[in-house]
Amino acid sequence: MKFIIKTQKGFENIVVNNLKEIVDDFNYIVSPDGYQGIVIVESDEDIEDKILQIPEVERVLKVYFETETDFDKIVNLAEKIKDYIKEDETFAVETKKRGKHDFSSTDINIVLGAKIKDLTNASVDLNNPDKVVHVEVFKNKTYVSITPGEKFKKYTKEKRNARELFKKVVIVQMPYLGEKIVCKRFGEAIGRAAQGFEVKELIIAPKEKVDAYELMEFIKGVKIGQHSRYEIQKRAYPFEIKLVPVTVQDLYQVVRDKRRDNRLLIITDPKGDELSKIKDKLAYDLRKKREIIVFCGSREGIPRGLFRFADYIVDLAPHMTFATEHAIPAALIALWGVYSGEDLENSSKEEKTESNSNGE
């Protein structure tokens, strides 16, 4: 019986040495084909539970089948895999390919997945599958593991999707201006944050005439940071990701344009209210408004004259100030806490009401 053990790079021998203390007899390969973070273990017994006792182990895949690393032979394993997937179950194929071959991970996912589907009549579900077929491709050998979908699932039906809120959020960011290299660095952080939260739009909004070249460097940084995060998202998510639109508009004109049509204007500033004091009303408005405009300052805060036009002025962390690059993550995480927390409270109230109506 073989197991593929995944660790942080450089921890492979630590795992092996710890395993020797709790398992009497096993064979192992450290960093197969030179790929760090992998240990392949073979034992006469099922030692998965013992392997998981080692803190340095991040993941264990029990090998169900192995074959030579040949596209047709890998796909033909569907004949064996079908016995582990029922017609009324859903499944997904996840391939991790190491090294150069004449096929891609996507090729395996598509063709093997299609053959399993034909053989089982099971449905493919890339988000919440009942079973996951893991295909681990090395230079000469390929291993297949089958796990319950929830075992390593990031996205479960029980978890609210934060995109419910963030897809309605427009970030209005005052640009960081000054030394050009610093402008660019701050721009990168802003671009990464806006793309990371997949907001509806990022508006770069200077409040007055500014140095064109300083602004240009800031915007260059935004683009670099945004695309850097976007490339990671494309690899990490099992669904399509879009680039967040980035525009430039005068700060005061943004306020004029957005003060209508069922929109919510929020300014983050130390002069505002604590979230705990406004969270109930804010949660209601976050749900009802079609668009949420969040204003973030830079070296200077949002001009005080605009406070009159905001629906909320929020102090995210009383007696503390955030660095420019932390404003977007701090604001959005705080708003998500308010938005999702309202659901939990409503759920609790509903459960309590139901219990009372049942005479409990």
Curated annotation (Swiss-Prot):
GO MF annotation terms: RNA binding; tRNA (guanine) methyltransferase activity
SUPFAM superfamilies according to UniProt: alpha/beta knot (SSF75217), THUMP domain-like (SSF143437)
GO biological process, one term: tRNA methylation
Domain THUMP: start-end pairs: 45-148
PROSITE patterns: THUMP
Lineage top rank: taxon: Archaea
PANTHER family to which the protein is assigned, alphabetical: TRNA SULFURTRANSFERASE (PTHR43209:SF1)
Protein name: Uncharacterized protein MJ0421
